[in-house]
A protein has these predicted regions:
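Short, cysteine/histidine-rich loop/knuckle motifs that typically chelate Zn2+
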Residues: 831-836, 850
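Acidic/polar, glycine-rich intrinsically disordered N-terminal extensions of enzymes
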Residues: 1-103, 265, 270-272, 276, ...
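Function-dense linear segments that define catalytic or interfacial modules
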Residues: 56-67, 78-155, 159, 163-169, ...
Length: 857
């Protein structure tokens, strides 16, 4: 039985509104406070309440002066205790006065105008990308407009490098343009965190470069700043099912040069409908061959993702005014060129009715309209990187109201994720939120006007809008609607941690509790720090406190451990000072406070215990009530059969409501698959696969390790490219005179064969080669570095080094022990902020369980 909506709405404000009160939010988890301090705190703000107060005032400032305080108080109430968590850019930027930033998490851009495939157009789009990244926004676009590899270019008399090669320009620029430097400031003027650009690129299944696109990230280091998705049409999926042929094709540039210049915009169906000619590049006897290639890449490497583009456009509320071919980086917003993703989430842990073992619908009815108004105001309050994006925001007024804490809330109610009861509750919840949000938007239209592109007849005829309750549709017909789209299930990596560590978005609880380990650059006051440590003899002294340390063994390593300030502290020879704390999901804390926690109960199942069907059925149920899209990762075990994996994607397509699918198969992020010059275009060579080394930039981040091997003290320098070991140098400590406290720096390549070290503490060493004791040492580091650059398995390198004998033994062991620390980190995903391997992949985004860094917010 679906829950009926009513017309109850927040009361009309009086002309004399009361002063705005301060919120009273409390962190119950130290991890949440750290995420606030590192990610959202602005300048000298005292706490989360000051941030929320500024956000509420700022978002209410677009209201009429006489009611601004009324709505500011409503927004304070909404934000208080994390009942509603705005998108990360709103929490971070609203109320700061920073005019170069935006409140919008992501933007979809793309080529426009005439001659879209020209170098001028490409450079124009790169300029747009730069402005989006500079403003802290994520970036998405479709590469369909780019001509295929090998196409003759008349103007230069040569061949085009193709769409995938050109993407390297976007990839490189994304690595350069970040918001933040990583340097500490003496004055607290702004934020504490570097925000790196997130990107999504899409390419259609008909494009002649699609095979190269599918295999692009199987080459180590290639297009690492992109998420990649293939646009799959209904026609292609039917060809796969019915074993029909499939042709890769592109406009006939020579046969319709003027039409190509004026009318080619990447929409092949539109091009062909106008009668313009195309060129067939390759025909697969069966479309399933190409589908199999895509599925194998996704199975083995988790990329590219798959987007069902016809489903996206058929269910688009603005089907009559726009065409969609791209998404934001995490896929929860399917958008046209110029589109923006304005995000916010209802925290379901604050809307549970424990007595009824159900959702608190009356409380939801109160707060959903306030959340819709809050988000609608952002369209008027936020800056945008480019004028066309601001125009898009105000013409369409899209918002993306979502949920977080879904998995935690179910666990609070003792309902197993994916169970029949959970699905029934989810169906009722989805319908309720959808109808309440649309009615709230219609109320706003009555007060403030409908969005400018609203066409009543066409809008109400839309496939998604027809799913609304008759009363809701009648309300829209009478008053119009303020926002073209209202709903989106987004990644909430940082946001869910900020909200006292609830589960993210639609995901189940990843782990009920776990140990968080964080490298500490400085010791807190009162903690004694080990010094003069002899790891073999197990002797040390301490400075700075009275803490008592004890020796323990983890694996084959000796470590020191103590307890201080309700945490376990460790000290090891490669990572230095470490802090360990126990992190618990919000639902676990809730049950512990009631004395009802039972980790063995069926309702306490986490992501590790769930079946694939639990994920897919949950997605299918909620997708019926979401007008934009959902960012949700289907986690599958390492031994999940490939044929069942393919069937999973076909089943998702057949729902007709899920707009895309992303999966993560356990253990598959590691593989750096061998690629040759021809394998990137889909051809396979026999014999031993050869990989091309990733080019070395002039400067590499460097981690500095000090250790003892067979009685000799060594310093090992590991150069890192995108967080992975790229090169290594090792020399005796007494030749370097480098303090053991120095842990990080930069390896600078001055010229071929000459490398200099500049540490973060200001030490500088010129020409590292001069510090080797012998030619054998230099030769061995060269060979190890060569193997690393070509993607050799680190575990294999370590095993070979440990077999060394003779005079080189101590030197080889020192390098082996150092590289051993990187084995597990390479075999899993590593955090780009702290290099932790303690990572979860959910909702299409990576979240570090140690430092809280999230690729998506």
């Amino acid at each position: 039985m679906l829950i009926e909506t009513t017309t109850a709405r927040p009361s009309t404000p009086r002309p004399s509104s009361p002063p705005v009160r301060k919120p009273q939010t409390i962190f119950v988890d130290s991890f949440s406070k750290e995420v606030f301090d590192q990610t959202y705190r602005f300048a000298t703000e005292s706490d989360i309440n000051e941030r929320h107060f500024k956000v509420a005032l700022d978002i209410a400032s677009v209201e009429r002066p006489e009611i601004q305080n009324f709505w500011a108080n409503k927004f304070v109430d909404l934000l208080e205790d994390f009942k509603f968590v705005p998108g990360g850019r709103i929490t971070s930027n609203a109320g700061t006065g920073l005019k170069g930033t935006t409140y919008i998490n992501c933007f979809v851009s793309g080529f426009r105008g005439e001659d879209q495939d020209s170098m001028t157009s490409i450079m124009d789009e790169l300029r747009r990308q730069a402005f989006i990244l500079k403003s802290e926004g994520g970036y998405g676009f479709c590469a369909d407009v780019l001509r295929p590899r090998g196409t003759f270019v008349n103007g230069i008399g040569g061949d085009s490098p193709g769409a995938v090669k050109l993407l390297e320009m976007w990839d490189t620029q994304s690595g350069v343009i970040t918001a933040g430097s990583g340097l500490e400031r003496k004055e607290k003027k702004g934020k504490n965190k570097i925000r790196k650009g997130a990107q999504m690129v899409t390419l259609s299944i008909w494009h002649p470069d699609i095979v190269e696109f599918i295999g692009a990230k199987q080459t180590a280091g290639r297009l690492t700043k992109f998420n990649m998705s293939v646009l799959v049409s209904d026609r292609f999926m039917k060809a796969v099912e019915n074993q029909l042929p499939w042709t890769l094709e592109f406009p006939d540039i020579d046969g319709a040069r003027e039409e190509y210049r004026k009318h080619w915009d990447g929409n092949l169906d539109s091009w062909k409908a106008k009668g313009y000619p195309v060129v067939a590049y390759k025909t697969y006897e069966k479309a399933s061959e190409l589908w199999d290639l895509l599925m194998k890449s996704t199975y083995n490497r988790n990329e590219p993702g798959v987007l069902f583009i016809d489903t996206i456009n058929k269910l688009n509320n603005l089907y009559y005014a726009e065409h969609i071919n791209a998404t934001n980086p995490c896929g929860e917003q399917v958008l046209p060129v110029g589109g923006s993703c304005l995000l916010g989430s209802i925290n379901l842990t604050k809307f549970v009715n424990s007595k009824a073992a159900d959702w608190d619908y009356e409380k939801l009815r109160t707060y959903i309209p306030i959340a819709v108004r809050f988000m609608d105001n952002v369209n008027d309050r936020s800056q945008a990187p480019l004028p066309e994006q601001l125009e898009n925001m105000q013409q369409k007024r899209r918002i993306g109201l979502g949920i977080l804490g879904y998995g935690s809330a179910l666990m609070m109610l003792k309902v197993r994720y994916g169970s029949d009861k959970a699905l029934k509750m989810t169906e009722e919840l989805g319908s309720f939120i959808m109808n309440e949000a649309y009615r709230a938007s219609a109320d706003l239209a009555r007060e403030k006007g409908a969005f400018p592109l609203y066409d009543a007849d066409k809008y109400l005829a839309g496939q998604f809008v027809r799913r609304l309750q008759p009363e809701t549709r009648a309300h829209i017909k009478k008053h119009g609607i303020r926002n073209s789209h209202l709903l989106s299930i987004q990644p909430t990596g940082n946001s869910s941690v900020l909200a006292n560590n609830v589960s993210g978005g639609l995901e189940p609880i990843f782990m009920a509790e776990y140990t968080r380990t964080v490298i500490q650059p400085f010791a807190p006051s009162g903690l004694a720090v080990p010094t003069n440590v002899n790891w073999s003899a197990k002797t040390f002294t301490t400075t700075g406190g009275t803490s008592k340390w004890e020796w323990i063994k983890e694996g084959d390593e000796n470590l020191l451990r103590t307890r201080f300030d309700d945490a376990v502290w460790k000290f090891d020879q490669s990572r230095g000072l470490l802090k360990e704390t126990q992190i618990k999901d919000f639902a676990v804390r809730y049950h512990e406070s009631l004395g009802t926690w039972d980790s063995r109960a069926d309702w306490a199942s986490t992501a590790y215990n769930l079946k694939i069907e639990d994920h897919v059925r949950t997605m299918e149920v909620l997708s019926r009530f979401v007008d934009a899209a959902m960012s949700k990762t289907v986690n599958v075990p390492a031994d999940y059969p490939y044929e069942e994996f393919k069937r999973l994607y076909m089943d998702v397509f057949k729902t007709g409501t899920i707009k895309g699918c992303t999966s993560y198969r356990e253990g598959t992020m590691t593989a750096v698959l061998a690629a040759t010059s021809s394998s990137s275009t889909g051809e396979e060579l026999s014999g031993i696969p050869r990989t091309k080394a990733v080019s070395r930039p002039k400067s590499l981040d460097c981690e500095i390790h000090t250790l003892t091997s067979d009685g000799h003290k060594w310093v090992v320098l590991v150069g890192l490219l995108d967080g992975d070991p790229y090169e290594v140098f090792a020399m005796k400590q007494n030749r370097l005179h480098l303090p053991s406290t120095v842990k990080k720096g930069q390896l600078l390549k001055e010229k071929p064969g000459r490398y200099n070290l500049l540490t973060d503490d200001g030490w500088a060493l010129g020409d590292i080669r001069t510090f080797f004791e012998s030619d054998e040492q230099e030769a061995l580091t060269r060979m190890i570095s060569t193997a690393l650059r070509h993607g050799a398995d680190i575990e294999f390198i370590v095993s070979q080094l440990l077999k060394s004998e003779g005079t080189i033994n101590s030197f080889a062991k020192a390098i082996a022990r150092t590289l051993k620390g990187y084995i597990k980190e390479i075999k899993t995903i590593r955090c780009s902020e702290c290099n932790s391997k303690n990572i979860k992949l959910q909702e299409g985004c990576f979240t570090c369980l140690d430092c809280g860094s999230s690729k998506c917010e």
